[in-house]
Amino acid sequence: MALKKKLNFLWTLVLYLIASRLPKAFGKDLPRVPTITDPKFIDAFLNIHNELRRKVQPPAADMNQLFWDQQLAKLAKAWTRECKLAHNPCIKQRYECLEDYDFIGENIYLGRIETQPEDVVINWYNESKYFNFDFNTCSEMCGHYTQVVWAKTVKIGCAVSNCPNLKGFSAGLFVCNYSPAGNFIGFRPYTRGDSCSMCGQKTCENSLCRPMNRKTPHHKAACHVLVLGFILQSLL
């Protein structure tokens, strides 16, 4: 009886040790999926969007600076979880996606889950080679580019989800939602002119129009997460 108990204990110990090492053994095969509250993820998408918006050619007189919007990010996250390589049908109707938002713009990218936000947005922006500003036409698909540089857009929220069997392979589905939406027929993405020359009551910050006293709330949210982490650590 004593021998049997000892063997059972040893088997339990062996199984525990194996289980405890599994994450270390296989963790590298499971890439981390950034969350919509991750400050690095947020800043990466924001910074590359704004960097490219201030570099448009011809220059833009009325290009707004983009700010992160958590409601748009939640909408993007919910849609990426569907793992469908298609646009969210709700963006076709006014106030359909979110109660207080009119039409919402959307860009989609399918690639590796490890793809960096900068590479995603640059991929969209590279469609600029197909866009003729003078005639406001596209020789090939360029709607992703025109949404990225749509001057009147001021809010953005992005997300990514791991889709294990999308189009026959495992992939990362990236979605960015924009408000106000761009790509209205008959309108150019921005007004040509000297940078910030049409900012109106807004201030000019590094070639982009920025509202007075505008704050970026996502850093505050990230701070709350850090404080909560310190509290939990102190309780352990």
UniProtKB/Swiss-Prot annotation:
Q: What superkingdom does the record give?
A: Eukaryota
Q: Matching Pfam families, A to Z?
A: CAP (PF00188)
One GO BP annotation here?
A: binding of sperm to zona pellucida
InterPro entries cross-referenced by the UniProt entry: Allrgn_V5/Tpx1_CS, CAP_dom, CAP_sf, CRISP-related, SCP_GLIPR-1-like, V5_allergen-like
Its membrane topology = Peripheral membrane protein
SCP domain segment(s): 46-178
Name by which UniProt lists this protein: GLIPR1-like protein 1
Origin species = Mus musculus
